[in-house]
């Protein structure tokens, strides 16, 4: 690998070329200033980063020793006292409110869906950024949200019976979201704008209007016969598209051809758990796509239905407001970027001792440099109109690590000439030590915090690893009913509201992991806004459009106001360990648990290691497609490792299960021409060996993280391919 030496850093030549020739021009930052500051950052803060990781291991060792002696805690007071004594559970300081300033309304005040997308994939990134607006008709027609009964099958061509059900659903949605003073939306015949009023002429000739006139936000086209009508509810917009020249509009009594919803209000462009970036070549791909998003020139050639076209970022949408002024609505989702956490290093840059630099330091420096194209002195202000950069920081353990991330951000701001606190922070509440010290974590970032989010997947992985020695864990499917998890979800909202996050920041909930099950999502995911979360994660633009309907039905600001008076969730519940009281499962139950875990692990790992795909839809044992990323992998691997450690299963049983399930995963991937089968070549399949490592060596992985094994095995495969 060719390297360029700068201020004691050995930088991969390809990364150096990208930074100097592509990322820096237009930012006002010159190469010497950048690399000098980057070197200072690495050499000043690298040792502190490593010390924090040592502290994680020391605390884990103390916990392991306690559990080996006591088992799962019964006397919670004694357990709590031990956690305080070792510095795991910290004293809580006085009440305070966060003071984060210059936050865009998409984060501060608008409640709505949030996408998380692998930024390494330009097509996915563009689709997500453009998912600010989505067709409700398409989302309903193309998913199981509308049942395929009574002749309403999806089929190949357009099915008018299905279309009629879609239209009826959308009209009922309009009745609930923007009711008319008289009549229903299904009675509408035509529309006009008279003065500042939307007039809806009904089939019987009577005139109606929205019951609440403030809900009419604007229109496009001729006021006597508008082409689009904009309505607003709970800060979210609905666009009714009127076009009688289209097949749908022609068949519609009112000429409505579509109902478009403001959908993914925010999107996390992910450099972490949903991607596989193990070296400089990969990191340049990640950073180049982020650069295209910040400069607004990211493009991707797409072929759909035999037609080729170029996908670009959508422009803003212009309408006429009721008072005649121009109403401009953002065309794109507000983008956040998720950097990696404090754990991993990357060979893209070496320090003066020849050691790999902490990847989190590199991500902070490079993603912020690139964000100058949006928020710098000459920035476009096309993403953040408030001049902020939004960085999601994952996998932090406790307030000291949050404070360290703030220190990194402050150093980067100073290096790049950004105002203090321009780099905002999203805190993933996905590690147990962060959960139990959440108030102090928020305090450490009180001038930067723009979201706290419960990542229940990683959080479950950490729960298992933290208490690995306490005993065999309950089955994975039973985790969601365990006392700690509901307490954790409520505690996050309670503490966030106590710290004054309303109006400043998002309180977020986790991912709906079944992208094909949209009817179930429509039924169930409304619990997130009802729980006081003003955002929640969805797996696709379509899911964002459907989940957006929940924020029309639930006014999250009102929910949050009502929750402020409730008693905070109990710490003792959060600290309860999900160990099986009587692990008396049948052999069949144990084997089914192993099969399901093994299938998820193999289905994900084989694509990660062999093809560098960091986010996959993997069929589970019941053939339901589940979105798998490193967080779901962490749970499955740690769960199997726990049962192995406590003798519920044997190593031979795990190997047999993995080999048997590998053949099933091979079959599920039979249609992929790039796929390398695992069955029959278990010793030589690097992916299969990686999957085994994750389980058989699961106890020794730092905090149960999967990155060290995945990175090592992917690099091994790339070296083999390059040889």
UniProtKB/Swiss-Prot annotation:
Tell me, what is an example of a GO biological process annotation in this record? glyoxylate catabolic process
- Binding partners and assembly: Monomer.
Which residues are involved in binding glyoxylate? 338, 430, 455-458
Family membership noted in the UniProt record? Belongs to the malate synthase family. GlcB subfamily.
Q: Does the keyword Cytoplasm apply?
A: yes
Q: Which residues are acetyl-CoA-binding? A: 116, 123-124, 274, 311, 539
Spell out the protein name for this chain: Malate synthase G
Q: Which InterPro entries match?
A: Malate_synth_C_sf (IPR044856), Malate_synth_sf (IPR011076), Malate_synthase_TIM (IPR001465), Malate_synthG (IPR006253), MS_C (IPR048355), MS_N (IPR048356), MS_N_TIM-barrel_dom (IPR046363), MSG_insertion (IPR048357)
Relate the protein's function as given in its record. Answer: Involved in the glycolate utilization. Catalyzes the condensation and subsequent hydrolysis of acetyl-coenzyme A (acetyl-CoA) and glyoxylate to form malate and CoA.
Reaction it catalyzes: glyoxylate + acetyl-CoA + H2O = (S)-malate + CoA + H(+)
Give the annotated active site: 338, 629
Q: Kindly state which keywords UniProt assigns to this record, in alphabetical order.
A: Cytoplasm, Glyoxylate bypass, Magnesium, Metal-binding, Oxidation, Transferase, Tricarboxylic acid cycle
Q: Its annotated pathway?
A: Carbohydrate metabolism; glyoxylate cycle; (S)-malate from isocitrate: step 2/2
Modified positions (Cysteine sulfenic acid (-SOH)) in chain numbering: 615
Q: Name one GO cellular component term.
A: cytosol
**Residues that hold Mg(2+) according to the record:** 430, 458
The protein's matches in HAMAP family, at most eight in alphabetical order, are given as: Malate_synth_G
Q: Which organism is it from?
A: Rhizobium meliloti (strain 1021)
Q: What is its EC number?
A: 2.3.3.9
Q: Which cofactor does it need?
A: Mg(2+)
Under Gene3D superfamilies, the record lists: Malate synthase, domain 3, Malate synthase, domain III
Recorded GO MF terms: magnesium ion binding; malate synthase activity
What subcellular compartments does it reside in?
Cytoplasm
